[in-house]
Amino acid sequence: MLNLKKYNQKIKHLLIFSFIYIFSFYSHTNSFPNNLNVPIGFEITIFADELNSPRQITETENGYVIVGSKKGDKIFALYDGDLDGYAEKKILIADGLQNPTGVSFYQGDLYFAEIDTIWVVKNIDDWLDKGSQTLPTKTVFMNDLPSETWHGFKYIDFGPDGNLYIPVGVPCNICLEPQTKDNRFAAIHKYEDGELITVADGVRNSVGFDWHPITKKMYFSDNGRDWLGDDSPSCELNVVDKEGSFFGYPFKHAKNVIDPEFGSMIPTVNKEFIDPIAELGPHVAPLGIAFYDNDVFPKKYKNSIFIALHGSWNRTKKSGYTVVFVKLDDDGNYLYQEDFITGWLSN
């Protein structure tokens, strides 16, 4: 966790996400890995441990941190009641679920996503504050999402427009057929008035997105395809300037990598290809991203992005395993990127 008395919720979420994920197998009494490197003035401590592959997190108005799970079947709330930086309470909210990865808190209610179903628990803070021994009532918000598990984890969040945003990854490394049969694949959608509307198309597998605090434009990460060598293609950071824009998959990757299987079809694709605003590196697997819009950090961090890089799994020399900072200018254009937290590979 970021050890500051005051911090922006979303950046806290990003950092807790990274650290909880890494330290799932550490107990509170174990020594903290001492090889993590952060900029001067920042400090990392363990906020929670002994969790089963936690992924997306969200925070309620009353300060409960809700945690989804990639491999487990439960949703938990974490609570640091004494404000010492460690969550002494872990409260079960739901169980018996299929990979309930995505969680989002909106207008008092908790939303969480399985592979093909999104649930809602109304007035979650009221239930948590009461300390009930009975699980809260959950109701189906929607239950007809694609059920494929390969790139099927659903990361969710509400946008500035009040709609729920849902990415649907492709059930493959590189393919075209699934999208031709079901256009929900390879895209990010918003759920508006009972239907899914495509916000970004040609997206292989996005598991992180956020909105610029000033422009309100949506920025999202995308995981690049595998098996084109150690150094190609790069994973991406994209911005949606126009709803429904096409970002290249499966025909083109990063800024200039033509796919060897589908690239020859580009002349037949009647769409404008949008390049990423930044290449994050090959096989780094970007996960959560978050804008920082508070005034506690040094000025350079404001209205720019932090991205958690899961790290490579099939590269000769490992890459990623960091949190990076992506600096944007006042108009939201990319300037540069730099490491913010490193050292996990040495642990």
What kind of feature is each model-predicted range?
Residues 116-158:
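Asp-box/WD-like beta-propeller blade repeats and closely related beta-sheet repeat scaffolds
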Residues 44-48, 89-94, 139-145, 195-200, ...:
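A short beta-strand motif characteristic of beta-propeller blades
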Residues 50-62, 95-113, 147-164, 201-216, ...:
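Beta-rich, blade/repeat-based domains predominating
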Residues 30-38, 153, 170-175, 183-186, ...:
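Beta-propeller domain segments
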Residues 66-86:
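Beta-propeller domains
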Residues 66-68, 112, 165-167, 219-222, ...:
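Residue position within the beta-strands of beta-propeller blades
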Residues 69-70, 115-117, 123, 169-171, ...:
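Short loop/turn segments immediately following the C-termini of beta-strands
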Residues 78-84, 121-132, 242-246, 325-332:
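Short loop/turn segments immediately following beta-strands, especially the blade-tip
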